[in-house]
Amino acid sequence: MLGPVGTPSKRLTYAVLVAWGTLAVQAAYAQCTAAPREVTTEVNNAPYDGRFTFARLGYETGPGGYYYHNLPAWAHGYPSSEKSLMKILDGVTGIVKPRMDRTNVVFIGDPEMFNYPLTYMVEPGYLTLNPLETKALRDYLLKGGFIIFDDFRNSRGNDGWGNFVEVMRQVLPEGRLMPLDSSNPVFHSFFEIKDPHAFISCYDGAGRAEFWGMFENNDPSRRLMFVANFNNDIAQYWEWSDTGFTPIALSNDAYKFGVNYVMYSLTH
């Protein structure tokens, strides 16, 4: 059973007793090195029917890409992570009733991408795009799509951040990456996340979690087009939340980010 999520902004009254400290941090680091719970790249998409369906972005892993447990970069944590998040989203919001039987994978450049207000991508540090994919991603963002970029850092000789910045420069050359602080509406769209940077990353020695984004017209008062969870792997906590392998508080915090991202994408 999934643990309770926490307390949303003036809506719910879940209470979680948290034992923070060394054990929590060690559990977080250990979780990042665990084998995936469900190893598959088989895609069995549900047909579009208007319901909210979680969609993961597929892409070709770039040269030197990280094939974790023989999975291509886009598939890390698929589909356990998003299935767990959909259970929480269905249970706590009272508003969004997501499709529960399946989550989808849509490859960048597929016109189906535009059916999804929110998409999710892991390992953008290994992302490469051809010109058609670059245009498709640009059009998606400018037409109202919202992307969660998750699970990347600088490691194993890979400049994950540098690669991500270069790809986004190609997609939105006029755009400017900006750090997201606690005042950004994405951290208050459902749950009140008072200090996002206090989130404990499961990456050992990666430094503190960082959150970056781009806004329409580079104006922070306008719509946020994507959020990049750098030095972070929020979905790893979703994937393992019902196993007892990680402290409930860490999974709760990760779910708060996920729910907020979904709610923001549906209301902006």
Language model features with spans:
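N-terminal secretory signal peptides that target proteins for export/translocation
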Residues: 1-10
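Bacterial N-terminal signal peptides
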Residues: 14-26
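Aromatic-Pro/Gly-enriched surface loop or interdomain linker
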Residues: 29-118, 124-125, 233-268
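An acidic, glycine-rich "communication" segment
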Residues: 36-38, 62-68, 154-243, 250, ...
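Short alpha-beta junction capping motif
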Residues: 54, 113, 118-161
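Extracytoplasmic/secreted envelope proteins and their assembly/folding machinery
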Residues: 82-86, 134, 138, 161-165, ...
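Surface-exposed patches in mature extracellular/periplasmic domains of secreted proteins
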Residues: 95-106, 149-153, 175-183
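Hydrophobic/aromatic-lined pockets within catalytic cores
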Residues: 145, 169-173, 266
